């Protein structure tokens, strides 16, 4: 069973490393801009880095859930490829935001697009599994007849 989801698991570890990296950047920014915990305001440069990291944390559960649902119920390889694009887009978002608030937009939009696609693929896969399991309707088989 574990071998069936190795790509999803590996990408999950990679994404957790990215989250840790972003958190470390906030720690470095705290030192650089002299913002001591629990304060979350101070230099605008610090605040942008902090907000970028917090936004990544806020979207992380959505990413993990949609990644695994699309991978389990639709296609693991395709979901993993989309997950790699998501990780890239979050990297672009984080460093764009750290530089200037307006530079975050491209990475943010790309990440939202990936999340939307993962959500749709997961929903389609779950619907197909439900129909096959409980109503004995195999959509993939029916589509091959066209």
UniProtKB/Swiss-Prot annotation:
Q: How does it sit in the membrane?
A: Multi-pass membrane protein
Which GO BP terms sit in this record? leukotriene biosynthetic process; lipid metabolic process
Superkingdom of the source species: Eukaryota
**One Pfam family, short name:** MAPEG
**A cellular component annotation (GO) from this entry:** intracellular membrane-bounded organelle
Membrane spanning segments where? 6-26, 59-79, 111-131
Enzyme Commission no:
2.5.1.18, 1.11.1.-, 4.4.1.20
Which InterPro entries does this chain map to?
A: 5_LipOase_AP, MAPEG, MAPEG-like_dom_sf, Membr-assoc_MAPEG
Keywords in alphabetical order, please: Endoplasmic reticulum, Leukotriene biosynthesis, Lipid metabolism, Lyase, Membrane, Microsome, Oxidoreductase, Transferase, Transmembrane, Transmembrane helix
Which Gene Ontology MF annotations are present? enzyme activator activity; glutathione binding; glutathione peroxidase activity; glutathione transferase activity; identical protein binding; leukotriene-C4 synthase activity
* Stated regulation of activity: Each monomer binds on GSH molecule but only one subunit is catalytically active.
Is Cytoplasm given among the entry's keywords?
Answer: no
Q: Where in the cell is it found?
A: Endoplasmic reticulum membrane; Microsome membrane
Provide the reaction this enzyme catalyses. RX + glutathione = an S-substituted glutathione + a halide anion + H(+); 1-chloro-2,4-dinitrobenzene + glutathione = 2,4-dinitrophenyl-S-glutathione + chloride + H(+); leukotriene C4 = leukotriene A4 + glutathione; (5S)-hydroperoxy-(6E,8Z,11Z,14Z)-eicosatetraenoate + 2 glutathione = (5S)-hydroxy-(6E,8Z,11Z,14Z)-eicosatetraenoate + glutathione disulfide + H2O
Query: What biological function has been recorded for the protein in this entry?
Result: Catalyzes several different glutathione-dependent reactions. Catalyzes the glutathione-dependent reduction of lipid hydroperoxides, such as 5-HPETE. Has glutathione transferase activity, toward xenobiotic electrophiles, such as 1-chloro-2, 4-dinitrobenzene (CDNB). Also catalyzes the conjugation of leukotriene A4 with reduced glutathione to form leukotriene C4 (LTC4). Involved in oxidative DNA damage induced by ER stress and anticancer agents by activating LTC4 biosynthetic machinery in nonimmune cells.
SUBUNIT field: Homotrimer.
What family does the database annotate?
Answer: Belongs to the MAPEG family.
For this entry, the protein name equals Microsomal glutathione S-transferase 2
């Amino acid at each position: 069973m574990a071998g069936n989801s190795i790509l999803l698991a590996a990408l999950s570890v990679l994404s957790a490393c990215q989250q840790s990296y972003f958190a470390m950047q906030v720690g470095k920014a705290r030192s650089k801009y002299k913002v001591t915990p629990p304060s979350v305001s101070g230099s605008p440069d610090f605040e942008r880095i902090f907000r970028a990291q917090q936004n990544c944390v806020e979207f992380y559960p959505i990413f993990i859930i949609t990644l695994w649902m699309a991978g389990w119920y639709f296609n693991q390889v395709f979901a993993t490829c989309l997950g790699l694009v998501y990780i890239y887009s979050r990297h672009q978002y984080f460093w764009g935001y750290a530089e200037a608030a307006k530079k975050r937009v491209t990475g943010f939009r790309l990440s939202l697009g990936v999340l939307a696609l993962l959500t749709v693929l997961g929903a389609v896969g779950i619907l197909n599994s439900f129909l096959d399991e409980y109503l004995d309707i195999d959509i993939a088989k029916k589509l091959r007849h066209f």
